Amino acid sequence: MPQVKVKEGEPFDVALRRFKRGCEKAGILSEVRRREQYEKPTQERKRKRAAAVKRHLKKLQREQLARKRLY
């Protein structure tokens, strides 16, 4: 759980923004959303496999674009 120490004279809004950023970096909200409903192990594997394929295709696309720029 992210912790934020409020500095003297620091506005509440700034401290809240730092806390939200810390939560986002820690992945707390995405974890909560993911656990809202039970996901079967097969569905989880399928989702992770699809995400891996998507990452791989995105990486290939970036590499091809980088090669194009060289010429």
Curated annotation (Swiss-Prot):
What family does this belong to?
Answer: Belongs to the bacterial ribosomal protein bS21 family.
A cellular component term from Gene Ontology for this protein is: ribosome
Q: Which domain of life is it from?
A: Bacteria
Q: Which GO terms describe its biological process?
A: translation
Organism for this UniProt entry:
Alcanivorax borkumensis (strain ATCC 700651 / DSM 11573 / NCIMB 13689 / SK2)
The protein, known as:
Small ribosomal subunit protein bS21
MF annotations from Gene Ontology: structural constituent of ribosome
| Lineage, top ranks | Bacteria, Pseudomonadati, Pseudomonadota, Gammaproteobacteria, Oceanospirillales
Per its UniProt record, what PANTHER family does this chain match? MITOCHONDRIAL 28S RIBOSOMAL PROTEIN S21, SMALL RIBOSOMAL SUBUNIT PROTEIN BS21
Q: Determine if Ribonucleoprotein is one of this entry's keywords.
A: yes
